[in-house]
Amino acid sequence: MAIRKYKPTTPGRRASSVSEFSEITRSTPEKSLLRPLSKTGGRNVHGHITTRHKGGGHKRRYRVIDFRRNDKDGVVAKVAHIEYDPNRTANIALLHYRDGEKRYIIAPRGLKQGALVESGPNADIKVGNNLPLRNIPAGTTIHCVELKPGGGAKMARSAGASIQLLGKEGKYAVLRMPSSEIRRVDIRCRATVGEVGNQEQINIRWGKAGRMRWKGWRPTVRGAAMNPVDHPHGGGEGRTSGGRHPVSPWGQLEGRTRRPNRPSDKMIVRRRRPNKKR
């Protein structure tokens, strides 16, 4: 994927860039794999804001992605198209299986239109093929990795993401995550060979607030710029330090967003930042 920079014809375009979409081969999605997608504006069923900075944005339709690929073992599929997906940073690939079925998958880096892919324990180790971890050699770069056998891909699904299979220990595979965390996963879990494509997406400069609003992102306002009724840091005559440690609008200390004592924590061999206090 290439990035095209705009000429500074306006203040909004001066610092902005856009993807050239050179890998995209079709602009119209497969109608049978579309589902309606309603907007929540970050609210729950009671109308209370549960996720800040969300709302508005262009209307979208959800593309149904096959994250399991376990019911098509041994059936060869041809990559019909590489398409854009507004619901994720990665591109998606439309597969035409030999039995006539069509499905979307996350498009790996280097997967081209017309390529053949396959899933199952006997599939070759090549980009786009989906296999159980026990059948993938150590040192292989993988993505779309399951956490539980048959649960569907949960890890390394965004643009440019990849996981390295370090080795196998009994009934577990040892993985190096994109965050440098090392964790164990059941060796029966599936993964797709290669890394997720569209890796240049991180280099796009949005240039103006309006482009973020098109994506459904609302402004992030500092607590110190609010009134006391809206935030613990709000109010004061002029600019003040707040006199306390940074907190959320509900008074919770900033940082430490990972929930401690998760059942899956016992599978972590080395944390992302081993020297940081938990």
From Swiss-Prot:
GO terms for biological process: cytoplasmic translation. PROSITE patterns: RIBOSOMAL_L2. Residues 16-27 have a biased composition (Polar residues). The keyword Transmembrane helix does not apply. One of its GO terms (cellular component) is large ribosomal subunit. Keywords: Ribonucleoprotein, Ribosomal protein, RNA-binding, rRNA-binding. Residues 1-59, 222-278 are annotated as: Disordered. SUPFAM superfamilies: Nucleic acid-binding proteins, Translation proteins SH3-like domain. One of its GO terms (molecular function) is structural constituent of ribosome. InterPro entries: NA-bd_OB-fold, Rib_uL2_dom2, Ribosomal_uL2, Ribosomal_uL2_bac/org-type, Ribosomal_uL2_C, Ribosomal_uL2_CS, Ribosomal_uL2_dom3, Ribosomal_uL2_RNA-bd_dom. Transmembrane segments: none annotated. Residues 45-59, 269-278 have a biased composition (Basic residues). Belongs to the universal ribosomal protein uL2 family. Part of the 50S ribosomal subunit. Forms a bridge to the 30S subunit in the 70S ribosome. This is Large ribosomal subunit protein uL2. It comes from Corynebacterium urealyticum (strain ATCC 43042 / DSM 7109). The gene is rplB.
